[in-house]
């Protein structure tokens, strides 16, 4: 069973259209932070803030190799 705090984090993450678009992009394939930021008028730092919200909700996972951060969808909390 999902606890209310986890559910609140998921709904908060999904409440923003930019984060929903990022999840849509990640549903197609893993992407770097730069690739996720490119379609929007936001900086890499701004994209990183959105990614942190998605990570805290458990919706994505981030892999770091050197300076490259690659994100992938983790739909577990939605099941």
Would you name each region that the model predicts?
Residues 55-63:
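Residue cluster at the C-terminal edge of the helix-turn-helix DNA-binding motif
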Residues 51-52:
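Short, hydrophobic-biased segments on the C-terminal half of alpha helices
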């Amino acid at each position: 069973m999902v606890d209310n705090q986890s559910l609140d984090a998921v709904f908060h993450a999904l409440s923003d259209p930019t984060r929903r678009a990022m999840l849509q992009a990640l549903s197609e394939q893993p992407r770097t932070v730069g690739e996720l930021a490119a379609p929007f008028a936001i900086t890499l730092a701004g994209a990183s803030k959105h990614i942190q919200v998605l990570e805290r909700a458990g919706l994505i996972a981030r892999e770091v190799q050197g300076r490259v951060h690659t994100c992938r969808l983790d739909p577990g909390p939605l099941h």
